[in-house]
Amino acid sequence: MRKGKTWLTGLLIAVAAAASVALAACSSEDENGGVGSLEIRLSALSATAAGLNAQVSETQRYVTGVEAITVTFSRVDVHRSANAGNNDAGWIEVLDSSRPLVERTFDLLLVAGGNFDVLGLTGLPAGHYQQVRVIIDEATVTILGVPSPLAISSGAQTGLKLNRNFTVFDGQETRLTLDFDAEQSVKEESPDSGIYSLDPVIGIVQS
């Protein structure tokens, strides 16, 4: 009877050890499984040179003569955790503020209608990621030749965090597209005030 208990105890220890090794292998594969790359693109929804349905309070007003909606990004980062805060370690830059201003400024009208531009491309450790953070420096809307600054929402200035699960595979490129909804993002303070703000509404599509 004592011998049977000893044998059973040994078996349980062996199984536990095997499970521990397997778990460690899986963890190692996820965290140290090589290097892939991530390309983040920018496209725009509902933005045309003919006009824009800007948000006014709870309604929309069609604004004609829209010639440009330019957005300057400070940086775009990704993180493995969906719960990571702005001050947490582990953010990886895909677009960073060291790049020239002209390379971080995009006209939403030029990336509408199925067009896109590349925000950034970088190598990343292979594995699972769950969050994209977008930080915007400034934005401008040009109507009938007159540029007007867009007041940026505080969230977009400190970091607009978008939850999106995606995987970077060893030796492969992953592409994410940020779909910037111009009509939902551009807001006018009051009808015909000419004072606009930007509260970004952004979706993410993986291709």
Each language-model region and where it sits:
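C-terminal motif of bacterial Sec signal peptides marking the signal peptidase cleavage site
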Residues: 22-25
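Bacterial N-terminal signal peptides that target proteins for export
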Residues: 2-13
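A short, solvent-exposed, low-complexity linear motif enriched for acidic/polar residues
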Residues: 27-207
